Amino acid sequence: MAAAEPTSSAQPTPQAQAQPPPHGAPSSQPSAALAGGSSRHEKSLGLLTTKFVSLLQEAQDGVLDLKAAADTLAVRQKRRIYDITNVLEGIDLIEKKSKNSIQWKGVGAGCNTKEVIDRLRCLKAEIEDLELKERELDQQKLWLQQSIKNVMEDSINNRFSYVTHEDICNCFHGDTLLAIQAPSGTQLEVPIPEMGQNGQKKYQINLKSHSGPIHVLLINKESSSSKPVVFPVPPPDDLTQPSSQSSTSVTPQKSTMAAQNLPEQHVSERSQTFQQTPAAEVSSGSISGDIIDELMSSDVFPLLRLSPTPADDYNFNLDDNEGVCDLFDVQILNY
């Protein structure tokens, strides 16, 4: 018997897979970006966020409707808008007013976010200008410090690095001066002056130091032609010894004339540093006991002669606003 031949109606075997195009051949399928007519950058979330924030800045009172924003930005998937709002809300830049509206924080009625940004730019420009001026001042300061250093280190100028009593009196003409040399940390207090019985104010100065002694000099000059009168405060004991010919009552005019006749004191003590140190204390006998007695007995003598402390210990403390004068029953003199 002859074998049966295959019929012509049999289906051919299907192909496995289409072979990829050769390397370098152009693709037959156009990209989705070109087919849609827009690039991938235009559909990115970053660009969409920039446009969304611009709408938020231009919105009245900073309130933006999300549906209107989606229509304006032509966003088909509203999920992308919600992704942006979730991030902004997470960093506390916006808050939800309702289900479909948000508001930029810190924007009140009648205020626009764009105006705030313009104001911020002006402030930044002002800060840059101030920083430029600060750098110029710092440069000027460095130049001055270097100039002072050059002057002080010069061997010729070193001999003149001191101030005389005459120089100080010329700066404060007609005033009674107290030159104070005190350690660092000294507390200075000037209470409010009180009116005396004669209508003049009573002035006080309280000094307190915990680290060292305080030295005070009284510097006075009656006229431009006279020499400065300088002696320590309080005066030494040898200057305040009672004289056999002391006067019991001296008028203020006599006290003034006596002050003009005081001998000249040494006033040119040098200093190798910038600190202004008072001149050396006057030697004993430079001011006669008669003149000191006349000054102390007058009504205008600015120094207080305190009585000796009692033999018993002092069992009380002074407050921070109290001074040594509070330990004695004395009347404050008028200056």
From Swiss-Prot:
Keywords: Activator, Cilium biogenesis/degradation, DNA-binding, Nucleus, Transcription, Transcription regulation
Region span, Transactivation: 277-335
DNA-binding region per Swiss-Prot/TrEMBL record: 37-108
Motif mapping: DEF box: 71-108
Compartments, record wording: Nucleus
Pfam name, any one: E2F_CC-MB
Feature: compositional bias, Low complexity: 1-18, 238-256
SMART domains: E2F_TDP
Ranges for region Dimerization: 109-205
GO cellular component term of the entry, any: transcription regulator complex
Database matches in SUPFAM superfamilies: E2F-DP heterodimerization region, Winged helix' DNA-binding domain
Location of region: Disordered: 1-40, 226-285
Function according to Swiss-Prot or TrEMBL: Transcriptional activator that binds to E2F sites, these sites are present in the promoter of many genes whose products are involved in cell proliferation. May mediate growth factor-initiated signal transduction. It is likely involved in the early responses of resting cells to growth factor stimulation. Specifically required for multiciliate cell differentiation: together with MCIDAS and E2F5, binds and activate genes required for centriole biogenesis.
Family of this protein: Belongs to the E2F/DP family.
Protein name: Transcription factor E2F5
Gene it is expressed from: E2f5
